């Protein structure tokens, strides 16, 4: 080891008596300075325009996206190392000094380890350049997430060391430094793209994925340290250092060709085995370095997986080859992406097993029938399979897939079926940018197989809003639209309809919804609803202006009334009957997501809403959930013509000003259980058209989901909201930005340049 350390010291002397080492340090410092100051400048501008509060500021500046400091520089680091490593051994070969090393009492491994340790020190100096920006971040960002950034630096350091080992081996192959550098770039490219090769072959796919360098350092930069990634870099370093030792040793000794060949094979096989075995789910250790544990599933999800015990969860993915919108996301080439998506869950439950079924069947897509041109489905499959170089025999026919499972109710879309202890449920994909189910939907699907499902019944018989229609005023989007992520059926609920004309309302449902009936409730219906209320059933009642007389008789038994008239709101942009209501502190108790919406001063849109009045005569504790803006809103009596002249307040016509509640929560104890009722003066806030509103940023989704979650006593949706970050403020000014630019663009690079120049001049004089 002493000899290796001495070689390392001599190699460092050689490195720093060359302008390349100094130049690379200066270039890296300037490059980092430009990225850092540009990001800080944008943050300073945002601070002046929108206020001083941000979210996850450390991540945004250092690791959050491709424009952040560490990822942006990571893409260019491969250019640095070959310029240093190209001369490590090539210089010895070309100058003849390798013969002196051979004749000295030094072992080959000491030569290789010494050279590599010199590179480890130089890489540490490169990391030290990053340290200057960490110091700046600590000064300018209160609650700076230091551990997150250190995790990123650790990943970059491992990557630099792996690059150095590769460059050292390439330098052992030739006496020409330029050839060594080019060869190093070739190996870098191979390791970057090997993970995309032969992805349709099962074992080869796993092997190439475990050998691929792509994404390894990025995971560490994101704050997730895994033994899989650390072992990968260790295996790469072991591989190329081992190959370097064997190469030099083979030129030093005379042995049959199969001896060094066997050594090469052993080192390669050992390295591949290390990379493959350490990437298997049961052998991976994790450490989440982020302050909010953003790389780890929430505690609620962890607890849910723990409750499943030792029984396995079977996940079967059904992919329709003819559904071109989704199949490319679930093809065999994407299998490793699927494994990575489920890795956070497998981390806490290793016996989640995955199965993949590929089939073809018709889908409700006009482009499919346009593509057929009279062909059969089988002929179309053969044509597409030939074009994509796939075996058509891997796809089950419609008859074969229907013997296993009938996916026509799912429109033969890509879907996953979860099985656990004899129960099963579907886990769907969605028509949004995220596409795949998030932690919330996965948690809901798993919990659906473990408990009795909360059921929401929608009253019918009085022309109420429909839960199954897609018309503007109806509720399919919120309740039963399978391709919509936030639909109740995808959040863990069951939804159904019920007619109180012919049957009693079950008392074991989560809630009954009475959504804007257009006809008066009959005495029998009122009696059955009252019986349900008296038994402690939860209830959602939604009314509309102009129909107060329909619901007020029922509401009177609750101590609530819908006031006559319509609330209007002055606005330069919207119709006067579109009221943008504020959330209240009472909403914070419904869900964490709604609490965050309240803290963010979010609004809920209610087009056509009336005010609610209440008293305590029925024994309920009443809290407003939504209130209209007292400055711009008033209650207009009489008919409202929204598309006529500008609506104005008229006390003479009976118009009222004041604080108007548009949604109320009512609670009381019945038979030892808290009864929960919500009354709203508008039924459109849950409608298909309102949930699709694009001209105002509203919290209708969050508000509606929170209400039904409240009815289920927190069973669904699963709460996966994460805590807010503490590093949300920037202690920075325009003058400070100028100082930082001066330091990182001028002072620091200038000091390095002067120091390196003086050292090189003194060395030349000697």
What are these regions (language model features)?
Residues 39-64, 173, 180-253, 625, ...:
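Terminal transmembrane helical anchor/hairpin motif
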Residues 280-414, 420, 426-435, 439-443, ...:
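Juxtamembrane extramembrane loops of integral membrane proteins
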Residues 150-176, 239-241:
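Hydrophobic alpha-helical transmembrane segments of polytopic membrane proteins
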Residues 476-714:
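Acidic, S/T/G-rich, low-cysteine, solvent-exposed domains in lumenal/extracellular/periplasmic regions
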Residues 19, 77, 81, 108-137, ...:
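Selective transmembrane-helix segments that form parts of the transport pathway or gating/packing helices
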Residues 19-45, 72-81, 187-190:
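Hydrophobic alpha-helical transmembrane segments of multi-pass membrane transport/permease proteins
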Residues 65-91, 126:
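Long, hydrophobic alpha-helical segments
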Residues 254-282, 288-307, 314, 439-455, ...:
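Extracellular ligand-binding/catalytic regions of CAZymes and related secreted enzymes
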